[in-house]
C-alpha cells in the first residue's frame, strides 16, 4: 500500500508496507518512469502525469492525502483510469436516494459493482452497509441485477432492512420468527416483484428447508455482512479439518453471479482464513485449497496448520479484489463530518420478546385495575388504602415494570442479578426461563464485536460507554479489558483516579459510566461514545454527548452510537427523545411549544408500546 500527496506540482509517494510486502510494492514503483527518490523524506517523487500509472499498478491500494480531484486540478491530465475514478464520485446512480453517500462510499459502491465479485474491508464506522446497498443500486441501474440476498447476524437483520429504506427508500423483507413465519417470509418474497431485498441470518442458511426455498429464488446478488462468520471454510481430509456450518452453507450460494463480502476484521494472521473468505468471493482468485496450502501454509499431519509464509505474495494476489479504508486516512477524515450519530438496531432474542410481552401484559392488567378503582377504601396486600393511595401504589409497580423493560433490552440477566428485586426474579420464574435462556445480550455481543474491530483498526481510539444502570455498567466492565468504571458508588478520590487513568494511560481504552459521569467531565481523549441504553430526557442525552463533543478533542471525527432493540421499549424511547430534542431546538430559536404537558418521556414510551401491543393482539384476534 502507498500514500500519495501533492506538493509544488509534484506527486510524492511513500511505501507503507511491512517488510513482507515492501519488496513487491517497490518493484511496482520501479515500473513507473520519471521517478526520483528523496532521501530526507523517504518518498518517491513523480510528475502529475504519472497518476494514471499509479492507479494502474496500485488501484484501490492508495491512500490519498488529498482528494484526487484536487490533486489534478489545473492540470491537463487525461487518463482512462483517472476519469473512471473521478466518475465514481458522481451522484448519477444515487439521484433517488434519500441520503446521499459520501464520496469515498460512492467509490466503494462503484468498485464492488465494477468488480462483480469483491470484498469491502473498511474500518469501523465507515458505512460498509450503504456501500453494499449502493453497489446493488448501480447494478439495478445497469439492468444487471433484480434481486438481492443479504446474509447477516441474527441481531442485525432488521437493522439492514431499516438501512435499505433509509438510504435507497426501498422496502426489504427480513426473515425472522417461528419456522412457519420464516417460510412465509421467504415464499412471500419469491411471489413479489416490487421488493428486491431479502435479509436472512447465517443460521437460516444452515437449515435445509429454508435453503431449498432460497435456492429456488433467482437471486442476482448475494452479500455476506460480518463475513468473518465464514472464515473457517477449509475442507482437508489429510489434516482432519472440516468447514464450519456457516461457511458450508454460504458456499452453496456460489451460483449467484454477483458476490460481495463485508467485514472490518477479515483475518487474524491466518492464511487459511484468507482462503475461506475469497473462496466464496471467487474461487479462481486463490485456486484450490490443496494448492494454496502448499504455497502459503506451514502444517503437519499431527498438529494441523501451524503457520504461514509468502504473505507478501498472498497480499498482492488478493489486493485487486478488496478495498479497505480506515478513519485514520486523511482523505476519509476530510469527507466525514465532525460528529456522526449512528443508530444500531438489534434483534431481540426469544427470551427478551417473551419477557417484554409478559411485562406489558402485567401493565395492562394493573391499568385496568386502576381504572376500576372507586372512591372508597381498598385492602391491598394487607393494607387499607384510599383511592389516591391505591393509585400511587399501582403507579409504583408500573414504574418498576418500566425499569424491567429497559433492563430486558440491555441484558435479561439483570432481572435475576443478586441485587435485583424479588418482583423481577418472579417475572423470570413465572415464564419458566432458565439461566441459559436469559444469558444472551445482543447489545453486549454487539459492543464486544465493535471493540474487537476497533482495537484492530484504530489502536489510538478510545470509547466512552454510558448506561443508566450500575449493574449493567459492572457487567460491561467485566467483559472489557483495558477499561475503567465510573459510578456514583465510588469515592471522589477513586473518580479522580479513574478519569486521570483514562486520559493519560494509552492502554486504558474504555470509560464505562452511569449517569454519574454525564455532566462536568472532560473526556475529549475519546472519539467514540456508545449509548448502551437511553436516558429519560433529551437534555441528559446531549449532556452525555458533550463529554467528548467539546472543544479540545484532537480527533477530526467523533461518532456517537445508540444501541436500540427493534420493536421494543428502546425504539419508542428513541422516537420520543428525538421529538423532544427537536422541540427544544424550536423553543430556543423562537418557536412555540404546542404539545401537551404532563407525561415524561418514559411514560409516553410505555403508552406507545402498550397501544402497539393492543393493536397487534387485535389483528391476531381478527386474523
Regions picked out by a protein language model, each given a short descriptive name:
Residues 276, 522-534, 558-562:
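A short beta-strand element within the Helicase C-terminal
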Residues 124, 257-270:
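Conserved helicase ATPase motor motifs in RecA-like P-loop NTPase domains
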Residues 275-287:
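A short helix-turn-beta junction within AAA+ P-loop NTPase domains corresponding to the substrate/partner-engaging
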Residues 77-111, 117, 126-247, 255, ...:
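SF2 helicase/translocase NTPase motor core
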Residues 538-558:
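Conserved SF2 helicase motif VI
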Amino acid at each position: 500500500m502507498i500514500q500519495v500527496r501533492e506538493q509544488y506540482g509534484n506527486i510524492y509517494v511513500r511505501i507503507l508496507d511491512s517488510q513482507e510486502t515492501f519488496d513487491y510494492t517497490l518493484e511496482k514503483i520501479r515500473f513507473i518512469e520519471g521517478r526520483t527518490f528523496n532521501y530526507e523524506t523517504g518518498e518517491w517523487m513523480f510528475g502529475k502525469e504519472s497518476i494514471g500509472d499509479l492507479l494502474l499498478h496500485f488501484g484501490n491500494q492508495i491512500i490519498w492525502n488529498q482528494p484526487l480531484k484536487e490533486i489534478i486540478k489545473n492540470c491537463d491530465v487525461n487518463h482512462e483510469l483517472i476519469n473512471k475514478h473521478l466518475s465514481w464520485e458522481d451522484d448519477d446512480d444515487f439521484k433517488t436516494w434519500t441520503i446521499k453517500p459520501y464520496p469515498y462510499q460512492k467509490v466503494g459502491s462503484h468498485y464492488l459493482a465494477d468488480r462483480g465479485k469483491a470484498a469491502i474491508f473498511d474500518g469501523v464506522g465507515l458505512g460498509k452497509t450503504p456501500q453494499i446497498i449502493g453497489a446493488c443500486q448501480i447494478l439495478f441501474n445497469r439492468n444487471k441485477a433484480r434481486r438481492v440476498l443479504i446474509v447477516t447476524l441474527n441481531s442485525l437483520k432488521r437493522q439492514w432492512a431499516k438501512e435499505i429504506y433509509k438510504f435507497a427508500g426501498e422496502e426489504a423483507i427480513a426473515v425472522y420468527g417461528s419456522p412457519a413465519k420464516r417460510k412465509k417470509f421467504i415464499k412471500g418474497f419469491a411471489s413479489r416483484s416490487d421488493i428486491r431485498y431479502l435479509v436472512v441470518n447465517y443460521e437460516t442458511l444452515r437449515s435445509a428447508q429454508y435453503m431449498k426455498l432460497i435456492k429456488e429464488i433467482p437471486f442476482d446478488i448475494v452479500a455476506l455482512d460480518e463475513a468473518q462468520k465464514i472464515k473457517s471454510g477449509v475442507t482437508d481430509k489429510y489434516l482432519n479439518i472440516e468447514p464450519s456450518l456457516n461457511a458450508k452453507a454460504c458456499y452453496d450460494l456460489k451460483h449467484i453471479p454477483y458476490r460481495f463480502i463485508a467485514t472490518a476484521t477479515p483475518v487474524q494472521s491466518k492464511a487459511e482464513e484468507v482462503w475461506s473468505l475469497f473462496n466464496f468471493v471467487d474461487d479462481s482468485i486463490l485456486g484450490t485449497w490443496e494448492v494454496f496450502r502448499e504455497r502459503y501454509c506451514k502444517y503437519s499431519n499431527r498438529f494441523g496448520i501451524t503457520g504461514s509464509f509468502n504473505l507478501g505474495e498472498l497480499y498482492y494476489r488478493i489486493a485487486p479484489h478488496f478495498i479497505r479504508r480506515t478513519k485514520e486516512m486523511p482523505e476519509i477524515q476530510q469527507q466525514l463530518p465532525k460528529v456522526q450519530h449512528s443508530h444500531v438496531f438489534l434483534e431481540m432474542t426469544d427470551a427478551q420478546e417473551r419477557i417484554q410481552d409478559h411485562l406489558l401484559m402485567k401493565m395492562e392488567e394493573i391499568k385496568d385495575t386502576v381504572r376500576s378503582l372507586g372512591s372508597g377504601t381498598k385492602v391491598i396486600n394487607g393494607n387499607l388504602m384510599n383511592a389516591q393511595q391505591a393509585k400511587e401504589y399501582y403507579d409504583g409497580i408500573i414504574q418498576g415494570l418500566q425499569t424491567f423493560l429497559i433492563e430486558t433490552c440491555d441484558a435479561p440477566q439483570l432481572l435475576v442479578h443478586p441485587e435485583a428485586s424479588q418482583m423481577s426474579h418472579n417475572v423470570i420464574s413465572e415464564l419458566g426461563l432458565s439461566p441459559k435462556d436469559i444469558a444472551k445480550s445482543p447489545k453486549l455481543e454487539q459492543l464486544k464485536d465493535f471493540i474487537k474491530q476497533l482495537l484492530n483498526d484504530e489502536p489510538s481510539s478510545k470509547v466512552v460507554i454510558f448506561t443508566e444502570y450500575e449493574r449493567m455498567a459492572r457487567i460491561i466492565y467485566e467483559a472489557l479489558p483495558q477499561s475503567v468504571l465510573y459510578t456514583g458508588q465510588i469515592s471522589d478520590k477513586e473518580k479522580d483516579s479513574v478519569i486521570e487513568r483514562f486520559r493519560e494511560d494509552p492502554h486504558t481504552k474504555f470509560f464505562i459510566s452511569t449517569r454519574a459521569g454525564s455532566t462536568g467531565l472532560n473526556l475529549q481523549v475519546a472519539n467514540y461514545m456508545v449509548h448502551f441504553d437511553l436516558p429519560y430526557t433529551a437534555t441528559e442525552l446531549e449532556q452525555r454527548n458533550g463529554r467528548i463533543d467539546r472543544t479540545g478533542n484532537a480527533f477530526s471525527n467523533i461518532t456517537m452510537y445508540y444501541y436500540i432493540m427493534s420493536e421494543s421499549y428502546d425504539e419508542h424511547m428513541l422516537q420520543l427523545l428525538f421529538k423532544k430534542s427537536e422541540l427544544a431546538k424550536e423553543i430556543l430559536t423562537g418557536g412555540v411549544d404546542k404539545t401537551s404537558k404532563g407525561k415524561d418521556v418514559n411514560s409516553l414510551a410505555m403508552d406507545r408500546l402498550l397501544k402497539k401491543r393492543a393493536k397487534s393482539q387485535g389483528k391476531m384476534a381478527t386474523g
